[in-house]
Amino acid sequence: MALSVRILGIDPGLRRMGWGVIRVEGSRLSAIAHGVVTPPTAAPLSERLMHLFNSVGDLVRQHGPDEAAIEEAFMAANAASALKLGHARAAAMLAPARAGLPVAEYAARLVKKSVVGTGAADKAQVAAMVGILLPGTKATADAADALAIAICHAHHRRATSLGSAA
C-alpha cells in the first residue's frame, strides 16, 4: 500500500488567501478540503497578517498536513503591493513552519505548467484542470490556485524522491 501524504497548498494574498489540502497516495491525488481566508479589509495590516497566521495555524491543526507549499512572490508593477504580498506570504508560511512542516515554494508559472501544461494559463484554465485532476472539486479561483500549488508540490516532491532513490 502506498504511503499517504497530505499537502496544504497556499495561494497567498492579503485580501483573499486561497488554501487547499490534498491527499497523495502513490500517483493518486484526492481533495480533502479547500477554501478562502478573508481577513477584515478595514483592519490594520498587523491584524490582517495575524488573521492569516492564525487561520493557517487552524488549518494545520484541523487537517493535519504533512507538508505545505506556497506560491512564490512575483514582481509586481506596484512595489507597495509586492511588499504587502510578501508580508502575507510570510504570515502564511510561518504557521506550518512553526508546526514543524516543510514549506516548499513554487513560481506561479511552474504551478500553471505543472497543472495545465503551460506557464501562461489563466485562472479559469487552472480551475478547470484542478476539477479534472481532483474529480468532484468545485473551487473558487483562489482555492483552485491553492489546490494547484498542492498538486504542483505533489508532482515535484515525487520527482525529487524518485531521483534521490535512483
Curated annotation (Swiss-Prot):
InterPro entries in the record: RNaseH-like_sf, RNaseH_sf, X-over_junc_endoDNase_RuvC
Catalytic reaction equation(s): Endonucleolytic cleavage at a junction such as a reciprocal single-stranded crossover between two homologous DNA duplexes (Holliday junction)
Origin: domain of life: Bacteria
Cofactor: Mg(2+)
Active-site annotation: 11, 71, 142
Cell location: Cytoplasm
MF terms (GO), sorted A to Z: crossover junction DNA endonuclease activity; DNA binding; magnesium ion binding
GO CC terms: cytoplasm; Holliday junction resolvase complex
Keywords: Cytoplasm, DNA damage, DNA recombination, DNA repair, DNA-binding, Endonuclease, Hydrolase, Magnesium, Metal-binding, Nuclease
EC number, UniProt record: 3.1.21.10
Gene3D superfamilies the UniProt entry points to: Ribonuclease H-like superfamily/Ribonuclease H (3.30.420.10)
Matches recorded under Pfam families: RuvC
Enzyme class: hydrolase
Cofactor note: Binds 2 Mg(2+) ion per subunit.
Purpose of the protein: The RuvA-RuvB-RuvC complex processes Holliday junction (HJ) DNA during genetic recombination and DNA repair. Endonuclease that resolves HJ intermediates. Cleaves cruciform DNA by making single-stranded nicks across the HJ at symmetrical positions within the homologous arms, yielding a 5'-phosphate and a 3'-hydroxyl group; requires a central core of homology in the junction. The consensus cleavage sequence is 5'-(A/T)TT(C/G)-3'. Cleavage occurs on the 3'-side of the TT dinucleotide at the point of strand exchange.
Protein family per UniProt: Belongs to the RuvC family.
Assembly, per entry: Homodimer which binds Holliday junction (HJ) DNA. The HJ becomes 2-fold symmetrical on binding to RuvC with unstacked arms; it has a different conformation from HJ DNA in complex with RuvA. In the full resolvosome a probable DNA-RuvA(4)-RuvB(12)-RuvC(2) complex forms which resolves the HJ.
Protein name according to UniProt: Crossover junction endodeoxyribonuclease RuvC
Gene responsible for this protein: ruvC
